[in-house]
A protein has these predicted regions:
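Extracytosolic ligand-binding ectodomains
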Residues: 1-139
């Protein structure tokens, strides 16, 4: 999208979702200063930064890795609580996840909507190719 916009002569700001988060900057290879994007992780958090450093050479999109990691760890916790023999008990465990401390934040599932409640998002831009957090939005 940035390549197409540049080729068309567009020089303004571009607001994106997770697809513009790193590794977009290194894949694109050019100045990304006009890109603004949301991310589900705070790359400045020490725990997140440590885990990101451990996996950045193994995965293409660290932020999406964190989401997947949290989903798997929530599933693990629910299976440990409810087992695999009773589908209703497992469903109840998933629907009632509360205060799970994950890499993307503290996750609580709303049993009525099945959506996570209270997860923050972070707005970033780039200084050339370096991510810069602008603001955290509480969930």
């Amino acid at each position: 999208m940035l390549t197409a916009a540049t080729e068309l002569g567009y020089e303004g700001k571009i607001v994106c979702g997770l697809d513009a988060a790193p590794s977009f900057n290194t894949t694109y290879g050019g100045d990304c200063s006009n890109i603004y994007y949301i991310n589900n992780i705070n790359i400045d958090d020490p725990t997140t930064a440590e885990m990101a450093a451990a996996v950045e050479d193994k995965v293409s999109a660290v932020n999406k890795y964190f989401l997947g990691y949290d989903v798997v760890m929530i599933a693990k916790q629910c299976i440990e609580e409810a087992g695999l023999d009773d589908a209703a008990a497992l469903l109840s465990a998933i629907e009632n996840v509360k205060d799970f401390k994950g890499l993307t934040g503290t996750v609580t599932i709303d049993p009525e909507t099945h959506m996570p409640d209270g997860m923050g998002m972070f707005m970033y831009t780039y200084d050339n190719q370096t991510p810069v957090m602008l603001e955290e939005f509480a969930g």
